[in-house]
């Protein structure tokens, strides 16, 4: 709760605050309802919940939430490992989540994980991912995010997927990117996507995160590193970088270990040293 409250004062406009998953499956995500009941809710900040299935969606819509995210893996093997369903069954489950969210007047983002590669199957066909994306839009998804679950993406994969999406009729305004920094390609992938017109990116404060069902996965690109980069590229994020760094340091204090974010330690490019 302290971390979410800290983040909600930085200028971020969207925060994925909780996940409605089985506590016995991922203990760290337990207590979603209690968290939502306790956080501050400043104007202009949208709080969403990750849900794996219809049951999770039903629990989420009973709480004070602004939107849902549902994840479907492009890799059948990863889907079985992650949610114990085939990709086809997971797509059906996602359609149910979208319907539940819309019935509750909530927006729903569909996230396609392993969109750039799978730790079990290797390469993932971007045309397959684009076909899944079109199907999810047809089911009513309000936004699409494409997850680089184990940091396998490079600019070549990013361009290939965007080419496939555009060819399938998916506009970049419907696209968000979700990069992990496992192989230190997260930021260059963001620059590549920016150059193609993508303007929405997932990130995690301090670089927290990973996936228990994706061997070798590390956290998402650190939020403060992303904000620093895109501001230096001339984009106005509306986010207070100094406040974001304070949130990253708080996150590090809460988890009790060193986080991989760089800007939280070095500071902005033009921060000078007092002598």
Model-inferred region functions:
Residues 1-275:
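Catalytic cores and adjacent flexible loops of soluble metabolic enzymes
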